[in-house]
Amino acid sequence: MNIDQHHQLQQQHQQQMLQQQAQAQAQAQAQAQQQQQQQQQAAAAAAAANAAATTSSSPRQVSFNVSDHYQILEIVGEGAYGIVCSAIHKPSQQKVAIKKIEPFERSMLCLRTLRELKLLKHFNHENIISILAIQRPINYESFNEIYLIQELMETDLHRVIRTQNLSDDHIQYFIYQTLRALKAMHSANVLHRDLKPSNLLLNSNCDLKICDFGLARSIASQEDNYGFMTEYVATRWYRAPEIMLTFQEYTTAIDVWSVGCILAEMLSGRPLFPGRDYHNQLWLIMEVLGTPNMEDYYNIKSKRAREYIRSLPFCKKIPFSELFANTNNNTSTSTSNTGGRTNINPLALDLLEKLLIFNPAKRITVEDALKHPYLQLYHDPNDEPISDKIPEDFFDFDKMKDQLTIEDLKKLLYEEIMKPL
């Protein structure tokens, strides 16, 4: 073999080596791409699994498009326009609740969401549910749902009343915490207007937090009372009589009435005024409280409402000690509607008498209710904080709600969500 042939063989060998290296590199790149695709598919599957929760009663899955910092556990609550899931915040290992809201089908739902969002950001109180974080959308175009990260509360008072007998100590503590939250809300010039057992959240430590501020309004703003009634679709059992009798203005007394209804329900294990409709609701109230006297009668400004009350049979007031006598004498140990209570604290009935007064001007105030002897064990004026008053323009969107489209409200919600907490 001459030198030229030797060089030619070397060149052929080098070309073969280069081809083999190129093939090996191409195979390695293909394998890497395949592995990357598999990893992406696995990550997507994991994210889909993480972002879906299934109710025990239904096979349907609910998509939660939240940060991968959260591991979705299960659905813990569901309402007309929101679903709440429990989740774990992975970095801190803290259990939280994530509330998914899809309000953009109806203006009313947008308004309720905007009120709640603004108020929960305003308050910072131990007995009012707080927002820990908000899942912010990438941009306005992708803004189709709202995710609020909140404290996780295991249950609510409605479920507790239905499943167990409450001790007098529990009742005192729950009413105290409710009034403590109301003191802060009313000091901020805010009426809740939808207090009921299902809106009082509880945890295993018996801590209570008020939620659902979708119907709340400013005390100073009374222009929208008619609009309030058209929107008031919640359970009527806890509504103050002045709401149904269209008083000219509503005061903090409407929330106080609701607290009275809740106290009565905890004492007996059943709703006190479970009206079937508007008329039956008023009749049940008057069956217990009696027909209004002349002073209270003329405090009702609506002539039509006064005429309706005059058309009803006269009722004599039933003292709560007598009304609850059947409960006191009940020796049942079941968890039925009777509550199974064999003894009711007379101080609880005394407070109830002051909470459930027909005339709102004569009803006990939150501050005086906190001082009542029934709550003496918990009352501490140095640990019942007030809140900053809401600005005058806080609820301006409500004043012009008839002119606002869903798109207008969506923009307001987007702006509110993008603001820092």
Curated annotation (Swiss-Prot):
UniProt PTM comment: Dually phosphorylated on Thr-230 and Tyr-232, which activates the enzyme.
Catalytic reaction equation(s): L-seryl-[protein] + ATP = O-phospho-L-seryl-[protein] + ADP + H(+); L-threonyl-[protein] + ATP = O-phospho-L-threonyl-[protein] + ADP + H(+)
Top-level taxon of origin: Eukaryota
EC number: 2.7.11.24
Chain positions with Phosphothreonine modification: T230
Pfam families: Pkinase
Family: Belongs to the protein kinase superfamily. CMGC Ser/Thr protein kinase family. MAP kinase subfamily.
Free-text note regarding domains: The TXY motif contains the threonine and tyrosine residues whose phosphorylation activates the MAP kinases.
Protein's name according to its UniProt entry: Extracellular signal-regulated kinase 1
